[in-house]
Swiss-Prot record:
Changing Y581A: Abolishes interaction with eIF4E1. This is Eukaryotic translation initiation factor 4E-binding protein Mextli. PROSITE patterns: KH_TYPE_1. Plays a role in promoting translation. It holds the Pfam family KH_1. It comes from Drosophila melanogaster (Fruit fly). Keywords: Cytoplasm, RNA-binding, Translation regulation.
Length: 653
């Protein structure tokens, strides 16, 4: 008999689901949003500083940071930076129990590994099971009544007859810990949810402006590097005080202390800011921190100490308000001079203003005299301006407190009033630099423009073309037409072409008001005097921007244009603008022994350009040029006979 098998309906059997325990559901509900997590971090940080925290809140924080750590790192990195400074310090606090400190260490290592918690969880779980055997009552830890709170290592209980730790007791203690942690997680989450923003942790207490962040106990030398590093915390509101306008103030601190200061990027609304200081030595970093603290408290730039001979040495150009402090070498004081810088209330570290002013006047007078002896006529105007500036500066220094050892308190260039009471200009002459400093704007301006006009004149350019040097090594002196012996200098005469309306300047310098500051660059109102007022400045600009002549035609055209510009202004100056010699004078110079003296770079000329050497043997006088014979040959040359064309044909026939 055949049996037919009827098909049975197949049921979809679901896989067994894991049992839902109370701890797992509690932990699932304990995941916090980012705002609540930030509030929980602030609450835990405040509790750790006041030794009034609970292990449950730290457990909840650890559980959430394992999940939301990377997201919080990207959103609010400054919050984690401030909190982990406290976590590092609290992990070394012996008043906290072992369990709390282990969780803090796990948090620190978790962030150090970029929130990769694979190996970290297994390691700290084994350590936690050992430390939890001792006192299960530590979950209700109170800093005031905790027995053995100052113990740094756990003391294991000993059973009566065995003398070891029971594995069953350890498992039971671990289960009790998990249950207690799960029960307290929801309570900690509720506390964090209702927390207010006033409980936000602040590393800097009132009255303190800078503090060590805790990352380095002191300026630490980086292994394998040649520099030290330290990290401090300042208020974010004080960042502008340290930074200054366009970073000038922090650059001055870096220059004085020879360090590099880096500010941490923070989000808007951050209360504090981390600052890293890198320097070659520990004392330089400490000095930078002292300068930062002094700058924040005074809300002013640090005081720059300059040697007295360099007073007024830093100067700016005519069209720039920035100082050239970048060329000043940084000076870091030693221990004793550092104390002299910072102890402003010590009377023994100061000298009287009168003595300092006299000392400065003597040194400036000596420097001016030496400058006059070297350059003579070229720096006559500079000497007068420098003497007036030195006298004015010495007078202005009276009544101010100055430091000894030939040092003077200089004004900071990182503030808005960096040029108040002091005017500085620079005149460039080739590779050389002339600096003019004074307290009278008109006098300094006149000195600069007079020097610009002189160094762009035809006389000075002719001396440059003749090979005159400014380094003192050249023995050749170029001939020049001297200035008139009587009367004032030529550039002070009202009718001369110096490029400056001195009649306006002299009249306005008596009252020294602000209306005449732009007289030099103002458009002239009178058509007749416009040419004479603009000739000097126009010639100065042409000399700086014109191309050097390479052909006689171009040079002749330029000289003709200069003579046309100078016509009608001053015949004496126009005649002195160009120096020419006749052939007899040049032949007389050729017979001088100086014309046969070897130049200083003779060896270099032989190596680089041997083709230009005409006489190879200088000892052979027969091959030398004889001026007398050449002049006689010109005068006694035979006259050529001029013959007509028809006579030439007759001769040919």
């Amino acid at each position: 008999m055949a049996h037919t098998h009827l098909g049975r309906a197949v049921k979809n059997i679901e896989a067994p689901r894991p049992l839902k325990t109370q701890s797992r559901s509690s932990l699932k509900n304990s995941y916090l949003v980012i705002e609540e997590l930030i509030q929980l971090i602030d609450n835990v940080t405040v509790g750790l500083q006041s030794c009034n925290t609970t292990p449950e809140s730290i457990t909840l924080l650890l559980h959430n940071l394992r999940v939301h750590g990377p997201q919080l790192e990207a959103v609010s990195k400054d919050t984690l930076d401030r909190a982990f400074v406290v976590f590092r310090n609290a992990s070394q606090d012996e008043r906290l129990n072992i369990t709390t400190r282990l969780k803090l260490l796990e948090l620190i290592e978790l962030r150090a590994k970029s929130w990769d918690n694979d190996d970290t969880i297994a390691y700290y779980k084994s350590k936690q099971q050992i430390s939890n055997v001792e006192l299960p009552s530590e979950y209700q830890y109170d800093a005031g009544v905790q027995p053995g709170a100052f113990s740094t290592s756990p003391t294991f209980g000993v059973s009566g007859g065995v003398g070891g730790v029971n594995d069953g007791a350890a498992a039971a203690a671990a289960a009790v810990f998990n249950a207690a942690s799960a029960a307290a997680a929801a309570q900690a989450a509720a506390i964090a949810a209702v927390g207010t923003s006033n409980q936000q942790h602040m590393l800097l207490p009132p009255g303190e402006v800078i503090r060590n962040s805790g990352k380095f106990p002191k300026p630490t030398k980086i292994p394998g590097k040649t520099y030290c590093k330290d990290e401090v915390v300042i208020r974010n509101a004080d960042s502008g005080k340290v930074m200054g306008i366009k970073g000038r103030r922090v650059h001055m601190i870096e220059e004085l202390s020879e360090t590099i200061i880096s500010f941490q990027r923070v989000n808007p609304g951050a209360k504090e800011r981390l600052v890293q200081i890198t320097g070659p030595a520990e004392d330089k970093i400490n000095y930078a921190k002292q300068l930062m603290e002094d700058t924040i408290r005074r809300n002013a730039s640090p005081v720059r100490l300059e040697p007295a001979p360099a007073v007024g040495g830093s100067c700016s150009s005519l069209n720039s308000s920035n100082s050239d402090d970048a060329i000043v070498q940084p000076r870091t004081p030693t221990g004793s001079s550092l104390a002299n810088r910072l102890s402003f209330n010590s009377a023994q570290n100061f000298m009287t203003a009168t003595a300092a002013a006299q000392q400065i006047s003597q040194q400036m007078h000596h420097q001016t005299h030496h400058l006059q002896h070297q350059q003579q006529q070229q720096v006559a105007a500079v000497a007068a301006a420098a003497a007036a500036a030195a006298h004015a500066q010495a007078t202005a220094a009276a009544g101010k407190v100055l430091r000894p050892n030939q040092q003077l308190l200089m004004h900071s260039y990182s503030t808005n009033d960096a040029s108040v009471g002091e005017y500085k200009f620079t005149v460039n002459v080739g590779q050389h630099l002339i600096k003019i400093t004074g307290d009278c704007c008109e006098l300094v301006r006149v000195a600069k423009l007079v020097l610009d006009d002189y160094f762009s004149s035809s006389e000075f350019l002719a001396s440059i073309e003749a090979g005159a040097a400014f380094d003192g090594t050249s023995l050749v002196t170029t001939p020049s037409t001297p200035l008139p012996g009587a009367g004032p200098p030529q550039f002070w005469l009202p009718g001369t072409d110096s490029g400056i309306g001195l009649n306006c300047v002299v009249s306005s310098s008596a009252n020294n008001n602000g209306e005449g500051d732009d007289e030099v660059f103002a458009e002239p109102s009178n058509g007749g005097s416009s040419t004479s007022n603009q000739n000097g400045l126009a010639r100065s600009r042409r000399s700086h921007f014109s191309r050097k002549e390479s052909t006689p035609e171009t040079k002749g055209a330029r000289e003709k244009g200069d003579l046309d510009d100078l016509a009608g202004t001053n015949s004496l100056k126009s005649n002195a603008s160009r120096v020419s010699y006749d052939i007899e004078h040049l032949l007389y110079y050729s017979m001088s022994p100086h014309s046969w003296t070897l130049p200083t770079d003779w060896q270099k000329m032989q190596e680089t350009a041997p083709s230009i050497l005409r006489n190879k043997d200088l000892q052979d006088e027969s091959q030398r040029f004889d001026g007398d014979k050449y002049l006689a040959s010109i005068k006694t040359a035979a006259k050529r006979d001029i013959v007509a064309a028809d006579e030439v044909e007759t001769l040919d026939e």
